[in-house]
Structures are given as structure tokens and as C-alpha cells.
Amino acid sequence: LIEQCLNTGYEDWSQLLPCDRALAVPSEAINPKHPYTKSIANSIGWQWRIPLQHRTGNGIVYCSKFSDDQAAADILINNLPSSALSDPKNLRFNTGKRKKIWNKNCLSVGLASGFMEPLESTSIHLIQSTIMRFFSLFPHKNDFRVEMNYFNNSIDEEFSSIRDFLILHYKLTTRDDSEL
């Protein structure tokens, strides 16, 4: 709705956050179960490992310019902590955000507003922040341009800050085994 009807536009951040693919695969549960997600850097991107009650969630995030799906799947499967429970599921995404999260009478929330990458689970925070910010500015009159402009400016700052935080993960590393 916000794109097809309102032509809001999308800011492409793929030059800043080049990872645009992920593969996800569950594996058998591991013990001991650690109460945290493990992020593991590798030569094509990074992997996640999330111990759950009855299985382990695993995935790899990478840039399609530097690796193909099969190479990523091989790295992922070879680094699983236990046997895979299914074939990897391929996920594709475009990093960036809507030019306006609130446009006229339409509010973009979650993946409709944008996506950076799953490294820090920032989408969960941005959903909550978007909803809370919108409710705090909820319009009580027909002309809500001031509230809408304030909302869009402040949420733009938040998206940009999170984007820059994610970029630091790649820019401050001393790794030299990857083009990322």
C-alpha cells in the first residue's frame, strides 16, 4: 500500500550494508543450552546459532556479490553443531528503508518500513520504537503534517544510527579473509 498506492520510495543501503542473502536451517538440540545467540564471523559473512528448547536455530548471512548460495550452504552445513533437521531455506533481502515511514494515512511497521540485516535483531527494536513513537504523536485533528514530519525525521535518525552501528561491525574488524 505505501509503495504501490502512495509511491513513497525506498532508500537503498546496499552499498553500506552489502549482505543481501541468508540461509536458515534448524539442527538437533545441543547441550548444554547457552542462554544467548552466538554470532560467528566467517570469510563470506557471519553465522548465527540460537539454542532453543527442542532444536538449534542456525543461519548464515552473506553478500551475493562475493558468494553463491551453494558455497554459503556448504559453509553453513559444515559448521552446524549437530545434524540438520531440514534443507536450508534461502532468504533474500534488500537493505534500506522507506523514504517516509508515515506517509499520509499509512504507517509502515516492521519489514514494510525497511530492513538492515539480522546481526543485532534491530527489527524487533524498530517495530516497538515505531509503534510507541506513533502513539505518542497520534493525530487528534485532520491536519497532522507537523506530527508526521516530526515522526519521520526522528525515525529516520533512529534508522540511520542503527545502520551506522551495524556498519561498525564490518569496518572495525581486523579480519582480512573477506571482501566485506
Functional labels for PLM-detected ranges:
Residues 1-83, 131:
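Predominantly flavin-linked oxidoreductase catalytic cores and closely associated redox partners
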Residues 23, 89, 107-109:
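Hydrophobic/aromatic beta-strand patches that form the interior of the parallel beta-sheet core
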Residues 49-50, 101-119:
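Short FAD-binding loop at a beta-strand-to-alpha-helix junction that anchors the flavin cofactor
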Residues 54-55, 63-90, 139-149, 153-159:
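Flavin-binding catalytic cores
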Residues 74, 98-103:
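Single, function-defining residue in the core of a domain
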Residues 92-96:
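Short, solvent-exposed loop/turn elements at beta->coil junctions and helix N-caps
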Residues 115-135:
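A conserved FAD-binding loop/helix module that cradles the flavin
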Residues 133-180:
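Active-site-proximal substrate-binding core of FAD-dependent oxidoreductases
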